[in-house]
Regions:
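Hydrophobic transmembrane alpha-helices and their immediate loop junctions
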Residues: 1-244
Length: 244
């Protein structure tokens, strides 16, 4: 592909398209099911991790899906409002999706639509992570291992931790503020979404880049996703099945 989407082009497209669809009569005609799922997801995230977490993770997910939505409008691809997926789990949600109808006009359009979601999510996930880490505390790791849950760190989160907290001594760890946990979840879901699998953003991007050869990458990616779902977080087994 000769052209690549950039942060600047994303913002430029956002300004023009937002003005266009805000002026249409159907802009505020959000289907009831989308509203109910949004409320249900806010409730499950609030119940699992509190108000600060719920607000921040919903903002990140909404920004991610609106990135796709805005690019769909730019390329005149019919797209639904986001469907949030409530789930009483570790995160309180399985994320959110939008439905696209009709033919995507070009590989450039597919690439831009696919990559705009992660860009939109990161715009909010990064400052939320930094603020959350600033509010977090370094404490001794509890002797009772059953009361302690250690989290893996996405590369960006690890860099932000060192920047905001510094090196943590042995026997200590960062006890994440709920806002920091929302940032961690946002970075984690963004990384997961960029896996080159079918209907995930990474699947769209890899197809736009290499076309039919992406089938090989897809098979490897779906295998890795199933292993992740089985051994790390069983809540994604249903999603893995739907991606087949």
């Amino acid at each position: 592909m000769d052209e690549k989407v950039s942060f600047r082009s994303y913002l430029k497209a956002t300004r023009g398209v937002i003005g266009k669809f805000l002026s249409t009569p159907s802009f505020f005609a959000i289907p009831r099911i989308n509203i109910l799922l949004f409320i249900a997801t806010f409730c499950t995230t609030y119940i699992m991790n509190g108000l600060g977490y719920a607000i921040c993770i919903m903002v990140i997910l909404f920004a991610h899906e609106m990135g796709h939505f805005i690019m769909c409008r730019k390329y005149r691809v019919d797209a639904s409002w986001p469907f949030f997926l409530p789930f009483p789990s570790f995160f309180g949600t399985l994320g959110a999706v939008i439905k696209m109808k009709g033919r995507i006009p070009s590989k450039r359009a597919l690439f831009d639509i696919g990559v705009a979601g992660p860009i939109g999510g990161l715009i909010f996930a990064i400052p939320i992570t930094l603020i959350g880490l600033y509010l977090s505390e370094v404490q001794p790791i509890p002797k009772d291992a059953t009361s302690y849950l250690g989290l893996g760190e996405p590369i960006l989160f690890s860099l932000f931790s060192k920047m905001m907290v510094g090196e943590v001594s042995e026997g200590f760890d960062i006890i994440l503020n709920p806002i920091a946990f929302a940032g961690w979840a946002g970075l984690f879901v963004t990384a997961l979404n960029l896996m080159p699998i079918g209907q995930l953003d990474g699947g769209h991007v890899i197809y736009a880049l290499i076309g039919k050869h992406s089938a090989i990458v897809y098979k490897v990616g779906i295998g890795i996703f199933f292993l992740f779902a089985i051994f790390v977080f069983k809540g994604w087994i249903l999603i893995a099945v739907l991606l087949l």
